[in-house]
């Protein structure tokens, strides 16, 4: 069985990060924005796991697990905020909302 080269993982992670960055810059919906940020975080996790598997250490995989847990908590808080905003204003368009400004 042949191993997949590291450049394939790095290229895939760069592609996923680019798609997520494009989504962050173009989407106005809050839920789509969180999904694109999660895609960018997952591409960083893919890099961590790929480098970890090629150096035969578990440091990158452990850090990726903590990053996944942190991303899940961030998504839960973000979705809760967006649900509260939706209940108050019946929309989640980020350009029109300025609730969190001082």
UniProtKB/Swiss-Prot annotation:
| Residues that span the membrane, as ranges | 4-24, 33-53, 62-82
Q: How does activity depend on temperature?
A: Optimum temperature is 39 degrees Celsius.
* GO MF, any single term: oxidoreductase activity, acting on NAD(P)H
Q: How does activity depend on pH?
A: Optimum pH is 8.5.
Superkingdom, taxonomy of origin: Archaea
Protein's UniProt keywords contain Oxidoreductase: yes
Enzymatic reactions: methanophenazine + reduced coenzyme F420-(gamma-L-Glu)(n) = dihydromethanophenazine + oxidized coenzyme F420-(gamma-L-Glu)(n) + H(+)
Q: Name one GO cellular component term.
A: plasma membrane
**Which family, according to the similarity comment?**
Belongs to the complex I subunit 4L family.
Q: How does it assemble?
A: The FPO complex is composed of at least 13 different subunits. FpoA, FpoH, FpoJ, FpoK, FpoL, FpoM and FpoN proteins constitute the membrane sector of the complex.
Which function does this protein serve? Component of the F(420)H(2) dehydrogenase (FPO complex) which is part of the energy-conserving F(420)H(2):heterodisulfide oxidoreductase system. The membrane-bound electron transfer system of the complex plays an important role in the metabolism of methylotrophic methanogens when the organisms grow on methanol or methylamines. Catalyzes the oxidation of methanophenazine to dihydromethanophenazine. It shuttles electrons from F(420)H(2), via FAD and iron-sulfur (Fe-S) centers, to methanophenazine (an electron carrier in the membrane).
Record's protein name: F(420)H(2) dehydrogenase subunit K
């Amino acid at each position: 069985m042949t191993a997949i080269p590291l450049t394939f993982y790095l290229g895939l992670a760069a592609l996923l990060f680019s798609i997520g960055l494009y989504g962050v810059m173009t989407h106005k919906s809050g839920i789509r924005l969180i999904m694109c940020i999660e895609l960018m975080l997952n591409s960083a996790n893919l890099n961590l796991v790929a480098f970890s598997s090629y150096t035969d250490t578990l440091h990158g995989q452990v850090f990726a697990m903590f990053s996944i847990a942190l991303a899940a908590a961030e998504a839960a808080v973000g979705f809760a905020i967006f649900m509260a905003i939706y209940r108050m204003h019946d929309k989640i368009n980020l350009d029109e909302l300025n609730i969190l400004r001082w």
